[in-house]
Amino acid sequence: MASLRQIAFYGKGGIGKSTTSQNTLAALAEMGQKILIVGCDPKADSTRLILHAKAQDTILSLAASAGSVEDLELEDVMKVGYQDIRCVESGGPEPGVGCAGRGVITSINFLEENGAYENIDYVSYDVLGDVVCGGFAMPIRENKAQEIYIVMSGEMMAMYAANNISKGILKYANSGGVRLGGLICNERQTDKELELAEALAKKLGTQLIYFVPRDNVVQHAELRRMTVLEYAPDSKQADHYRKLAAKVHNNGGKGIIPTPISMDELEDMLMEHGIIKAVDESIIGKTAAELAAS
């Protein structure tokens, strides 16, 4: 068996990270790759399209019911779904209580100790990425995830999050083997989106792995808790995910240490592409009425 590829999908909340990752992994499984998904998002939605489920029972919730994580067996937490993809959700505490990253740490240790990573080609971590706090950075910090793919769009906050995630990768790149595999742009149909995605990739020293076009078939599939690959395998969108999967598959060992930019540089990039205008300092703090009167 080829060496295990440990990849991770990061991205800001609501960007379509889990949808993009599950469709990409379904396409990799179509190619004959054996996949394990480890959901590291408290929403526990990283496997729903593979399992046709609302949300998979998480390791933390199952451990709480059983008494402790030591009381669990691998078959208690792992489910097998579309294309024989193995699925696990780490889970997290109730909102406002404790560190959500704790589930990530507990889960990865449990899975490793119980042989979950045997006889597979890819482990994929699906990680919340608005903030790269200690817990959510666990797959990076502990040298678990070797290739990071950031799902983003042409929206400013999605690019801001991508840059922040790159800072997290840079922090741990020298002490471990983690590298940025590239950006995946999940189209939101904003102005000059492809240009901006390519420009940000260049600034970060990486590549735009794929530009995933927006298509309503994705939502139709999601409503049925299915990937596009399963719901509409002959669709153009399914082929886009297959092309994305092929790009990821052929990208092994090609990751880079990113070169994150400052907020000012990000705003300058948006100005260069005509997305925002140069800020007139004289209008800062002025109300609409005050501006109209001036």
From Swiss-Prot:
Keyword annotations from UniProtKB, A to Z: 4Fe-4S, ADP-ribosylation, ATP-binding, Iron, Iron-sulfur, Metal-binding, Nitrogen fixation, Nucleotide-binding, Oxidoreductase
Cofactor note: Binds 1 [4Fe-4S] cluster per dimer.
CDD domains: NifH
PTM (free text): The reversible ADP-ribosylation of Arg-102 inactivates the nitrogenase reductase and regulates nitrogenase activity.
EC class name: oxidoreductase
Coiled-coil portions: none
Keyword Oxidoreductase attributed: yes
Positions of modified residues (ADP-ribosylarginine): R102
Cofactor(s) essential for the protein: [4Fe-4S] cluster
Binding locations of ATP: G11, K12, G13, G14, I15, G16, K17, S18
Sequence positions that bind [4Fe-4S] cluster: C99, C133
InterPro entries linked: NifH/chlL_CS, NifH/frxC, Nitrogenase_Fe_NifH, P-loop_NTPase
GO biological process, one term: nitrogen fixation
Gene3D superfamilies: P-loop containing nucleotide triphosphate hydrolases (3.40.50.300)
Role noted for this protein: The key enzymatic reactions in nitrogen fixation are catalyzed by the nitrogenase complex, which has 2 components: the iron protein and the molybdenum-iron protein.
HAMAP family assigned: NifH
Assembly information from the UniProt record: Homodimer.
Family the UniProt entry places it in: Belongs to the NifH/BchL/ChlL family.
Protein name in UniProt: Nitrogenase iron protein
Source organism of this protein record: Bradyrhizobium diazoefficiens (strain JCM 10833 / BCRC 13528 / IAM 13628 / NBRC 14792 / USDA 110)
